[in-house]
Regions:
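Pyridoxal 5′-phosphate
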Residues: 1-173
Length: 176
């Protein structure tokens, strides 16, 4: 079989499966519990958190694990909105975002008073940077754009979006 949807779901690398097997069969304990296999689970999570933090130049306590991309997207948008709503209520995203982003933006509009601007894309799915830049207001607290579209393969100009956010808004928060 030839599999052409790696942008959406990729087969797990064999070395990852091998590294994870003990936690599916031997050390499957709840890391918040006090029994021995729980301690092994907690050790692995702590070590993984430290390794990821080191790669990202972050502190281990700044690393959170979620069940997947949709949960992460929901959390990023809702948490950012709640944390910065005293500075503004405007979010910018694109019309072609993943439903996890679009539905969360709709929720924030209807339930939390957010103002969301959905900027367009060109025929290749690339965000219209002029439209994005024009959408920035003093109330803008977040720009959320997917780095690469899993359906059409478009790679967005993330560095340019970050530059625009910092230059015009001074908040500089972007969710990619």
């Amino acid at each position: 079989m030839i599999y052409l949807d790696n942008a959406a779901t990729t087969k797990t690398a064999p070395e990852v499966v091998e590294a994870m097997l003990p936690y599916f069969s031997e050390y499957y304990g709840n890391p918040s519990s006090i029994y021995a296999i729980a301690g092994k689970s907690k050790e692995a999570i702590t070590k993984g958190r430290e390794q990821i933090a080191n790669v990202l130049g972050a502190k281990p306590e700044e690393i959170y694990f979620t069940a997947g991309g949709s949960e992460s997207d929901n959390w990023a948008l809702k948490a950012t909105f709640e944390a910065y709503k005293n500075k503004g209520n405007h979010i910018i995203t694109t019309k072609i975002e993943h439903h996890a982003i679009l539905h969360t933006c709709e929720y924030l509009e209807k339930e939390r008073g957010a103002k969301v601007t959905y900027v367009g894309v060109d025929e290749n799915g690339v965000v219209n940077l002029d439209e994005l830049e024009a959408a920035i207001t003093p109330e803008t607290i977040l720009i959320s754009v997917m780095a690469a579209n899993n359906e059409i393969g478009t790679i967005q100009p993330i560095n340019e979006i970050g530059r625009i956010a910092k230059e015009h808004n001074k908040i500089g928060r972007a969710h990619v």
